């Protein structure tokens, strides 16, 4: 094997030789983080956090700043790509039982929550019509908190309605949180290196390890290159593919959009929120849709770690994926039959996975013991 740079070699740990492409999404997420922070910095240089100037400053960036349209679209499309990668990353973790490494899984779930908060704050910044109303609807959920709700909402808004102080603090939070994400990502990786990566078979990799470089690093580079290629294809030919047409209009508190909805990556949680006709119940369900991921390390009952050799649980997993897509789709529709019923059934099915999965694990154990 050729000699490599000492610093590079010492920082790259040996891993199992059989890890698949599903293990590449960690490095892709790291690339997305670097891309978002770098493009975000250049956008922040030209952005003005003022309700009268924010929308105009976005137009200024797109039209007047050299390559500003590239920065703005890279940042917007990059956010969608970030969430696509993180959802695949989480699905891989659920399928292969990576949640059994509790420190890594819980730090990852914390990262997801902070990432969702960061993306929400960022969505408000252009001060378009959908940005304003999405912020109004979501921040209003704080009023569902007993006793403290109204005080918390006023504190978050910086007044009695969403106004200039709200935009200023959202910009400050959107700027600072990515650095917290970077720090937590470092902790996430350090915790992972305590035990090392799992593999598709769920077996101990100690007997068959290879250096990350060059074997797995080239695979990482290929997937990162593919991701960046996809990013630039969308940027060049379909830059507004994931934008809401309502957001091309400046925020107007006097006019409500016909259908208020957040970005696609929040639609699953938003659909769960809408499916419950009670404000407090919907808010709790919204929070639980993400927090419930933290329960998986404590409810795993099967003797076998991954789902690779568990056909019953595999069927349950793919039902969860289909449910996730269905919930996302229903959130794009109006709150009317049959979409209300579909989202309610899909929401129950989504949460059922986390209840039925341990039961299936227990049933599989019984079957194995009998055989």
Curated annotation (Swiss-Prot):
Binding-site positions, a ubiquinone: 193
CDD domains membership: cytochrome_b_C (cd00290), Cytochrome_b_N (cd00284)
Keyword Mitochondrion: yes
Listed Gene3D superfamilies: Cytochrome Bc1 Complex, Chain C
Localization of this protein: Mitochondrion inner membrane
Alphabetized PROSITE patterns for the sequence: CYTB_CTER, CYTB_NTER
Keyword terms: Electron transport, Heme, Iron, Membrane, Metal-binding, Mitochondrion, Mitochondrion inner membrane, Respiratory chain, Transmembrane, Transmembrane helix, Transport, Ubiquinone
Cellular component annotations (GO), alphabetically ordered: mitochondrial inner membrane; respiratory chain complex III
A GO term for molecular function: metal ion binding
Disulfide bonds: none
Membrane topology type: Multi-pass membrane protein
Free-text comment on the cofactor: Binds 2 heme b groups non-covalently.
Obligatory cofactor(s): heme b
Binding site for heme b b566: 89, 188
Subunit and partners: The cytochrome bc1 complex contains 3 respiratory subunits (MT-CYB, CYC1 and UQCRFS1), 2 core proteins (UQCRC1 and UQCRC2) and probably 6 low-molecular weight proteins.
Misc: Heme 1 (or BL or b562) is low-potential and absorbs at about 562 nm, and heme 2 (or BH or b566) is high-potential and absorbs at about 566 nm.
Task performed by this protein: Component of the ubiquinol-cytochrome c reductase complex (complex III or cytochrome b-c1 complex) that is part of the mitochondrial respiratory chain. The b-c1 complex mediates electron transfer from ubiquinol to cytochrome c. Contributes to the generation of a proton gradient across the mitochondrial membrane that is then used for ATP synthesis.
Protein name (database record): Cytochrome b
Organism: Toxicocalamus preussi
